[in-house]
Amino acid sequence: MRALDIAGTGMQAQQTNVEVISNNIANMTTTGFKRQRAEFQDLIYQNLRRVGSNSSDSGSLLPSGAQVGLGVQTAAIYRINEQGNLQQTGNTLDLAIQGNGYFQVTLPSGETAYTRDGTFGLSPEGQIVNTNGYVVAPGITIPTNATGVTINTSGQVQITLDGQTAPTTVGQISIATFPNEAGLDAQGDNLFLQTSASGNPVTGNPASPGFGSTLQGFVESSNVNVVTEITDLITAQRAYEMNSKVITASDEMLSTLTNLH
């Protein structure tokens, strides 16, 4: 009985849906996290009577066919890249991007990774690094005798030194955008890598055309909406239960049919 397999695909799809929702809820306080959404599509159809076929009686064209779908499958899990709320931290090295763009960090392998998490600090060498100790590109060093650090909305990093009143520029933070952000490969640790699907990164200074601006002393909160996630969770749970009831009903029908023989 096909209904057993069809309902099974429905349960698998909703299990994936619940896993995505669970991950969203788990990361509701993760800095720079973007919620995800599972998308589904129907499977192939079995033709009981092909659309556009001729009637065996009169030879006339039948106005409709008889097709039975074979279930559902996960088509994609999209990342919703809506802006998260900005949270003030009081840390002068923390940065939030308001608008488009990703910070760039250099991995130990030399590869560049991308992130919306602007929780930054200093390495023992005085370089600006993320929470994993990866250097924020293009690599900016703050001298030990600096008494203050200012990062403007354009990503320009300036310091104040002892005995000086005028600030000194020590670097420029650049950010990157992609033709297709959905094509980025999530690595964990709030990091992404480019892929052939994302396209090559386009880098530029914050607040320039096409790029968001940087805000010092802030980080971007997760864009997860708990009310939305709980609503989606209830919907997915009910859909899972309905599919399980189809399996139960189909099994009972199959048992009845077997007993007739």
Regions from the PLM with identified roles:
Residues M1-H261:
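Amphipathic alpha-helical polymerization modules
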